[in-house]
Amino acid sequence: MPVLGSQRRLLGSLNCTPPATFPLMLAPNRTGPQCLEVSIPNGLFLSLGLVSLVENVLVVAAIAKNSNLHSPMYYFICCLAVSDLLVSVSNVLETAVMLLLEAGALAARAAVVQQLDNVIDVLICGSMVSSLCFLGAIAVDRYISIFYALRYHSVVTLPRAWRIIAAIWVASILTSLLFITYYNHTVVLLCLVGFFIAMLALMAVLYVHMLARACQHARGIARLQKRQRPIHRGFGLKGAATLTILLGVFFLCWGPFFLHLSLIVLCPQHPTCGCIFKNFNLFLALIICNAIVDPLIYAFRSQELRKTLQEVLQCSW
């Protein structure tokens, strides 16, 4: 990506240098103290991408196979899996081409590699934006199902869900094209960072409100059963743990990447910010890890989906 760092660009592989021997090293900074740089080998990128690819393909296959899963909620989960799938495909493709170029097994002109790099950048940016959008859509869907349970099926209908899905994909494609075209404009970066903060705030507010309602409901049941403390404490701790994992994974996997974008605007020449810029590959690896974790949080917890997944695996064997 042009603005995000030079480490992962395909053009750099045309004139490659030997990789670092140690994965964790101190990178010299001419204008300040030494920086801690985490080097992510291409093999690790490839492995993470393949794991995420397999996981999300299974989610899409399971939802497509089982007609009981053809509902708005599972369609949003399916689209999240497709977004994560595109993140994985783009990174696997880029890593594979880089490895082939470095090994001399693939001969390509700089112009061809530039075009391929642009296509991959559009894929990565579009899939990132759509992934964030579908995470927000899933949160809104769950919120409506809890607070407007009686009206849920009249509010969240299949036609509306399809329109939302189409709008998200169109917006993601347009956003990625604008980002690649105007990557050197500060406003574009600030809009992306603002979008991430908005999604984080939306998810935090909705899930915290859902947890509060669930705890209130549990207290009501406990009072009826005259066992208020044991049920309330256990349920509250379990709900808080689930919420912490959900929001924590989201923030830890996406936060460093958008911190990187923020610092490009705020302090592009500062030595400390320069140290953070050197770890861009680590931030990309965390996003791929998020694509691995998403199916575990949003898809595989469904008993119906797990059952269908077993059938899919049995058919494949």
UniProtKB/Swiss-Prot annotation:
Disulfide pattern: none
Cytoplasmic side: 64-72, 141-163, 212-240, 301-317
GO molecular function: melanocyte-stimulating hormone receptor activity
CC annotations in GO: plasma membrane
Cross-referenced Gene3D superfamilies: Rhodopsin 7-helix transmembrane proteins
PROSITE patterns for this protein: G_PROTEIN_RECEP_F1_1 (PS00237), G_PROTEIN_RECEP_F1_2 (PS50262)
One Pfam family per UniProt: 7tm_1
Compartments, record wording: Cell membrane
S-palmitoyl cysteine-type lipidated residues: 315
Topological type in the membrane: Multi-pass membrane protein
UniProt-listed InterPro entries: GPCR_Rhodpsn, GPCR_Rhodpsn_7TM, Melcrt_ACTH_rcpt, MSH_rcpt
Glycan attachment residues as annotated in the record: 29
Spans within the Extracellular topological domain: 1-37, 94-118, 184-191, 267-279
Keywords, sorted A to Z: Cell membrane, G-protein coupled receptor, Glycoprotein, Lipoprotein, Membrane, Palmitate, Receptor, Transducer, Transmembrane, Transmembrane helix
Transmembrane parts of this sequence: 38-63, 73-93, 119-140, 164-183, 192-211, 241-266, 280-300
Cross-referenced SUPFAM superfamilies: Family A G protein-coupled receptor-like
CDD domains: 7tmA_MC1R (cd15351)
Job description of the protein: Receptor for MSH (alpha, beta and gamma) and ACTH. The activity of this receptor is mediated by G proteins which activate adenylate cyclase. Mediates melanogenesis, the production of eumelanin (black/brown) and phaeomelanin (red/yellow), via regulation of cAMP signaling in melanocytes.
Similarity-based family: Belongs to the G-protein coupled receptor 1 family.
Complex formation: Interacts with MGRN1, but does not undergo MGRN1-mediated ubiquitination; this interaction competes with GNAS-binding and thus inhibits agonist-induced cAMP production. Interacts with OPN3; the interaction results in a decrease in MC1R-mediated cAMP signaling and ultimately a decrease in melanin production in melanocytes.
Entry protein name: Melanocyte-stimulating hormone receptor
Organism: Rangifer tarandus (Reindeer)
